[in-house]
């Protein structure tokens, strides 16, 4: 509906990527039909009654143009910009396109070539910047741009002490030039005026009211391009030219020349009385904003409004397409941006202003009546049971028949606004055949008697709406999708049979609605022809289409070539566990694999049974032996985790020798030497020294430090003072009823439970049993 303003010129001029046609035409940038009289009927995508849609008409006039309205240049990276003078094939320097946009700014606003230059020094810097950017790809086109008749002009802004002109690109070739205005007192910097947010400190020339006021920190002179269709500023969430990094081979310069791209997205605007569709991140009461701005600012409210209707996570650079083609905004009439010239066909500047004024005024009046900012809030509310009727009532109004142009409009314009200007055009070099074949076959595969289910315009994103509402939004579509499933007889697939009770939402649960395979899921005309295109549209997720830039012709043409017969025969190889939808293989989670046990012989089943019995016997054996050698288990599993310990049997107080425990040769000091078992080895160490675990000697008085002291709880015995002289008699007492442990005489020990201090799980409780005679065995 709104995308062909620029593509008409591209269709005429870019078959061979000869961008001079655009660069040398002052009127060609914004006069819709100045060079293309054959494409006047393509200005409104929704009014085309041809089954092949308006996109097919574009292909009839342009053999080398892709039938995506946003990307009609076969090899032109800047699909939407007829103003791009540097669209060399497959050149990825996005800075080359800034020059043409500044040129368009001159053409649009009629800057005076002699009076509106701020300063010759600054102007020279700007030309140097343009030359630097264009030398990367096309010096010839650059020379055609910078000439006496059509050179980019910098808007006049007075009292600016530094002229900073550089590209919005991440290109290493961007040139930043600064020059001082001679004779101007450098009282304050330009950024100081802007930080005060006092418009009066900056003297804007009234004659040049169309000056671009950029309040970014770096104060780029942004590239204003008239051919941004709906005259809206694209707030791109700080992506601007960088956002096409995912499509460097396809559309690197595409999105950035359609709009004014903001660095910080807070205060950029165009003070132009013809441009009412100003998009800002936050509502503003500033008088410089137009009166109707508050009703339209939801278009770019952090891109959330667009994300509700489009899976728009990375490359949402054509917000006006989302806005005017959205089924929820269907009450908005078609604004006459596609015919900006006078009725008499004269391509003068007055026609543009009149067309914009009339179209926007009429459109805004209807918007005020039918659609306000509250509609965005209304969608943000909890989705109730009337959600089905909301879609059905709002979807078909003001739309052309779904089986004709609207279906392809979904394919090529709105399927996945991650690449608005590059829908169905992952590969500018290859998608010519891909899209042409697809659209030529769509007419014959459409079911004219079946209604549309839903459009790709309605594709809520998980990233922007709550999971509850996302689930309900597709759950509400379950009923029509079930009908759609039954009517298309997908259950009779030659590869896999699915019960008719299975709904499409269940089949596509993991693939489609996660936006990981199908992009934005357009199910129009009761066939799944659009699935081929959707896979090509999602450049962010579908690695197959993004990486195989040279193979899309083979992939998609093979699929689309059989759409006329709808016979599912071309891709039936190796379709086990898949459902073939119009020759497009789609993996589904419901496909049941053959039961392996059905193919096993009786002998194999017996062997399996025997193995299971053996395992059960082993388990029972372990259970029967679990109480044996419990002290050894206790030692290996628990005591070995402590640095120092001694274990006495309850009835036999002699020291149990787990290792080669020789006599306490060092037990001569008052400091009490003892054997410590560290990781299964004997370590003779004095208490004065810190062992490698930095623990203290355990006894009944330091149990808070060492939990092993719990083992040494005695039921009776002498106090430590009474056995102070028994340090050297440890060996002689080995066969008595008492034993020496440091300064403590122990006669009897009671069994205790060692419990893991961090949990109370019974599995972590180890019981110490008495009279375990097999502890050393």
Swiss-Prot record:
The Basic and acidic residues compositionally biased stretches are 597-606
Q: Composition bias, kind Polar residues: at what positions? A: 334-343, 391-407
Ranges for the region named Disordered are 1-101, 128-150, 219-267, 334-366, 391-466, 529-577, 590-622, 713-751
Q: Where is the composition biased (Low complexity)?
A: 128-147, 243-265, 408-466, 532-574, 731-740
Composition-biased stretches, type Acidic residues, lie in 344-366, 607-620, 718-730
Q: Which domain of life is it from?
A: Eukaryota
The name this protein goes by in its record: Putative uncharacterized protein DDB_G0287457
Organism of provenance:
Dictyostelium discoideum
């Amino acid at each position: 509906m709104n995308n062909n303003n620029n593509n008409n010129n591209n269709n005429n001029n870019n078959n061979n990527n000869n961008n001079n046609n655009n660069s040398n035409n002052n009127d060609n940038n914004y006069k819709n039909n100045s060079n293309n009289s054959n494409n006047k009927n393509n200005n409104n995508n929704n009014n085309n009654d041809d089954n092949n849609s308006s996109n097919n008409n574009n292909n009839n006039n342009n053999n080398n143009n892709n039938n995506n309205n946003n990307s009609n240049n076969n090899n032109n990276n800047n699909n939407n910009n007829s103003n791009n003078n540097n669209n060399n094939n497959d050149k990825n320097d996005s800075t080359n396109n800034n020059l043409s946009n500044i040129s368009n700014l001159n053409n649009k606003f009629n800057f005076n070539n002699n009076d509106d230059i701020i300063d010759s020094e600054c102007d020279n810097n700007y030309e140097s910047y343009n030359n630097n950017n264009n030398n990367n790809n096309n010096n010839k086109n650059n020379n055609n741009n910078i000439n006496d008749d059509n050179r980019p002009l910098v808007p006049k802004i007075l009292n600016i002490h530094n002229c900073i002109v550089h590209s919005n690109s991440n290109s290493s070739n961007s040139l930043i030039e600064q020059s001082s205005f001679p004779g101007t007192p450098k009282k304050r910097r330009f950024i100081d005026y802007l930080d005060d947010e006092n418009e009066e400190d900056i003297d804007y020339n009234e004659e040049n009211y169309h000056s671009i006021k950029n309040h970014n920190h770096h104060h780029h002179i942004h590239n204003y391009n008239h051919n941004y269709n709906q005259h809206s500023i694209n707030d791109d969430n700080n992506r601007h030219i960088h956002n096409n990094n995912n499509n460097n081979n396809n559309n690197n310069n595409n999105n950035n020349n359609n709009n004014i791209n903001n660095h910080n997205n807070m205060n950029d605007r165009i003070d132009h009385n013809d441009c009412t569709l100003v998009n800002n991140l936050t509502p503003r009461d500033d008088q410089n904003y137009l009166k109707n701005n508050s009703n339209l600012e939801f278009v770019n409210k952090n891109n959330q409004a667009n994300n509700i209707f489009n899976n728009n996570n990375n490359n949402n650079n054509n917000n006006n397409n989302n806005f005017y083609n959205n089924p929820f905004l269907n009450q908005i009439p078609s604004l006459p941006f596609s015919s900006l010239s006078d009725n008499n066909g004269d391509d003068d500047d007055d026609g543009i202003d009149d067309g914009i004024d009339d179209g926007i005024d009429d459109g805004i009046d209807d918007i005020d009546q039918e659609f306000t900012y509250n509609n965005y809030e209304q969608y943000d509310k909890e989705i109730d049971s009337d959600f089905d009727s909301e879609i059905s009532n709002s979807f078909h109004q003001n739309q052309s028949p779904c089986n004709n142009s609207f279906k392809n409009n979904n394919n090529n314009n709105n399927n996945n606004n991650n690449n608005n200007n590059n829908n169905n055009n992952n590969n500018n070099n290859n998608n010519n055949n891909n899209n042409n074949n697809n659209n030529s076959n769509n007419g014959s595969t459409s079911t004219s008697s079946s209604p549309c289910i839903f459009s790709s315009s309605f594709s809520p994103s998980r990233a922007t709406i709550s999971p509850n509402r996302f689930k309900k939004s597709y759950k509400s579509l379950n009923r029509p999708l079930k009908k759609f499933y039954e009517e298309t007889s997908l259950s009779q697939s030659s590869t896999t049979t699915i019960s008719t009770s299975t709904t499409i939402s269940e089949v596509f649960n993991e693939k489609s609605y996660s936006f990981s395979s199908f992009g934005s899921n357009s199910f129009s005309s009761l066939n799944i022809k659009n699935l081929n295109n959707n896979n090509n549209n999602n450049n962010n997720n579908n690695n197959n289409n993004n990486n195989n830039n040279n193979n899309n012709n083979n992939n998609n043409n093979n699929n689309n070539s059989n759409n006329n017969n709808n016979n599912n025969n071309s891709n039936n190889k190796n379709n086990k566990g898949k459902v073939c939808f119009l020759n497009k293989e789609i993996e589904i989670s419901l496909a049941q694999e053959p039961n392996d046990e059905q193919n096993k012989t009786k002998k194999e089943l017996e062997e399996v049974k025997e193995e299971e019995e053996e395992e059960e016997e082993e388990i029972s054996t372990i259970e029967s032996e679990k109480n044996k050698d419990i002290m050894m288990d206790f030692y290996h599993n628990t005591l070995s985790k402590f640095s120092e310990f001694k274990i006495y049997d309850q009835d036999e107080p002699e020291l149990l020798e787990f290792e080669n425990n020789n006599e306490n040769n060092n037990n001569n000091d008052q400091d009490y030497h003892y054997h410590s078992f560290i990781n299964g080895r004997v370590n003779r160490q004095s208490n004065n020294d810190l062992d490698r675990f930095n623990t203290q000697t355990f006894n009944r008085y330091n149990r808070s430090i060492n939990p092993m002291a719990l083992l040494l709880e005695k039921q009776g015995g002498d106090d430590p003072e009474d056995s102070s002289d028994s340090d050297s008699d440890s060996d002689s007492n080995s066969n008595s009823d008492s034993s020496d442990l440091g300064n403590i005489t122990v006669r009897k020990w009671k069994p205790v439970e060692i419990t893991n201090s961090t949990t109370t799980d019974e599995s972590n409780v180890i019981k110490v049993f008495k009279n375990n005679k097999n502890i050393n065995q």
